[in-house]
UniProtKB/Swiss-Prot annotation:
Chain sites annotated for binding NAD(+): I177, D197, R202, L264, G265, I266, I288, Y289
Protein's cellular compartments: Cytoplasm
InterPro entries cross-referenced by the UniProt entry: ADH-like_C (IPR013149), ADH-like_N (IPR013154), ADH_Zn_CS (IPR002328), GroES-like_sf (IPR011032), L-Threonine_3-DHase (IPR004627), NAD(P)-bd_dom_sf (IPR036291), PKS_ER (IPR020843), Zn_alcohol_dh (IPR050129)
GO molecular function: L-threonine 3-dehydrogenase activity; zinc ion binding
Sites where the protein binds Zn(2+) 1: C40, H65, E66
UniProt remark on cofactor binding: Binds 2 Zn(2+) ions per subunit.
Biological source species: Vibrio parahaemolyticus serotype O3:K6 (strain RIMD 2210633)
Enzyme Commission (EC) number: 1.1.1.103
Assembly information from the UniProt record: Homotetramer.
Name of this protein: L-threonine 3-dehydrogenase
Entry's family note: Belongs to the zinc-containing alcohol dehydrogenase family.
Co-factor(s): Zn(2+)
Amino acid sequence: MKIKALSKLKPEQGIWMTEVDKPEVGHNDILIKIKKTAICGTDVHIYNWDEWSQKTIPVPMVVGHEYVGEVVAIGQEVRGFEIGDRVSGEGHITCGHCRNCRGGRTHLCRNTIGVGVNREGAFAEYLVIPAFNAFKIPDEISDDLASIFDPFGNAVHTALSFDLVGEDVLITGAGPIGIMAAAVAKHVGARHVVITDVNEYRLELARKMGVTRAVNVAEEKLEDVMAELGMTEGFDVGLEMSGNPAAFNSMLTTMNHGGRIALLGIPPSDMGIDWNQVIFKGLVIKGIYGREMFETWYKMASLIQSGLDLSPIITHHYKIDDFQEGFDVMRSGMSGKVILDWE
């Protein structure tokens, strides 16, 4: 049987609607009928066919890894899932036999394979993934929110890396993940949550999500904002979401001594920084990749159930046949999360 899917068909700019074979369910897998998918920054890189994509993405391949759907078939070894369960899923498929997997640090598996990056993805009518990777969505969480659990998980993993209660938090990069991380920081009890960017559309989104200050660094100095907030000693926690060298260096300069930084943004490989800031301030820097399995997922559900409102971050909806409009608006930078409806 053939199904509709969005695929990277050619090694050039673009993504194409295609027909592919319906995937087969293995012993340990579940088959998910996709309801909604969201477009990730990674999908935009794949669309643009940038240097990273050219090195990483096999062609042809079905793309996408942010989704929600319904379980419609179950492999014979699978326990804990039933037909009709509403699920999203962890996009990092791990090996299960390396030291980190066996030691319970699954998110640090050295043999990780990415759904829609190294193997067939979720932008299709059906997706097969290992049942281990699926996560049941509580009834009170909407399909829209469930479809963005993957990037929300990046935000939660980064934000909750360090204690935030009563702390002053700087977030560099107001993309959707940065904005969600800011909302989490505020929700769990940070004092001042300041986010920086140069994209006024996204800074306005951050304001809607309740940050203390959203700062356009092209127009005002971070140091002036800190003075205005009565901050005399610098930020306690930094969440770097942009991969922008100037943003990271500005973070290092404005951190308090003993400050802690979680790094999710991917900088150019040869980024230079002022190491004196790190050493003489005694800063701690932690690299973040993916989500903790599955601690981050349970935290995500609990945060929403405890009143965290992410709805402003979802700005655009399109039917799947209009996917091109969705990619165009994502590439323009004038959007939050963009959702594609498969039903």
